């Protein structure tokens, strides 16, 4: 019995994580809260991506696709109009 008690005492003295102070608890639970927040944000981004926006306005800078007009020229026209508006 004495040998097992001695080995337990030796193991307890080698345990450097036995006593936790407030700072280590704060770090641990802060990491849990941060991970939960990231999970919620990523899941919201994935779920919101599939929902179509019903109030989309093409004049807010979004480029909608038209037939026969390439994207590059449309972007150029939008920039040109914005430059004229600033004059």
Swiss-Prot record:
InterPro entries: UPF0239 (IPR009621). One of its GO terms (cellular component) is membrane. Signal peptide: none annotated. Keywords: Membrane, Transmembrane, Transmembrane helix. Residues 63-72 have a biased composition (Basic and acidic residues). Its main location: membrane. Residues 73-87 have a biased composition (Basic residues). Residues 52-87 are annotated as: Disordered. It comes from the Eukaryota. It is found in: Membrane. The keyword S-adenosyl-L-methionine does not apply. The chain crosses the membrane at residues 25-47. It is a single-pass membrane protein. The keyword Ion transport does not apply. Belongs to the UPF0239 family. PANTHER family: MANNOSIDASE, BETA A, LYSOSOMAL-LIKE, MANBAL PROTEIN, PROTEIN MANBAL. This is Protein anon-73B1. The lineage of its organism: Eukaryota, Metazoa, Ecdysozoa, Arthropoda, Hexapoda.
